[in-house]
Design a protein with these regions (language model features):
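Nucleotide-activated chemistry modules centered on ATP-dependent adenylation/adenylyltransferase
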Residues: 1-174
Length: 174
């Protein structure tokens, strides 16, 4: 079997301006990029939890355009949906046995179970030296300070602010 000589490079992609600008910068500057990984939160088994206009943009504009540029897009989904979580019961802690109902801002089990968990499960299938590009702008210092290990912001590397990211996406038709 052939040994892999270079680490994989993936973009965590929400299809917002910062993650799309990260992809565009990688392409523009010849940065290694193996795939864009998007984790779609589903409302139920058939309906996306994304705002319909954003979902349409993702599937009908962004993914096809990225694939034409040579960027593979991978879509992850959790086994559980928003409805599963909303109607489920708490399994641990002082509220054990109670219905979950509406998620509490800042303690959002939907983010944890429908976005972070499937992404982490996927990450475990990747080599440990995989580099993860994160779309955090040059002017978002508090967020940049939270980057760890193999996480890299190309927006920071190339001194792109959120406004610069927006303009880059607009120029690219994204």
């Amino acid at each position: 079997s052939k040994e892999r000589s270079k680490p994989l490079h993936i973009v965590s992609c929400s299809f917002g301006k910062d993650s799309l600008a990260t992809i565009l910068l990688a392409l523009e500057h010849g940065e290694p990029l193996d795939e864009a990984v998007y984790c779609e939160v589903m409302f139920d088994k058939t309906i996306s939890g994304e705002v319909p206009e954003h979902r349409d943009f993702i599937y009908h504009t962004a993914i096809p355009k990225l694939e034409r540029m040579g960027v593979k897009a991978r879509v992850l989904r959790a086994e559980k949906t928003y409805v599963d979580l909303f109607t489920g019961t708490v399994t641990r802690g002082p509220k054990k046995g109670m219905l979950r109902a509406f998620p509490i801002c800042g303690k959002c089990y939907v983010q944890r179970d429908c976005k972070i968990r499937p992404f982490r499960q996927y990450q475990r299938t990747l080599p440990p030296d995989t580099v993860q590009y994160i779309g955090i702008a040059h002017d978002e210092w508090e967020r940049l300070l939270r980057l760890t290990g193999q996480q890299v912001s190309l927006l920071e590397k190339y001194h792109f602010t959120e406004e610069d990211a927006k303009q880059l996406c607009r120029k690219a038709g994204l």
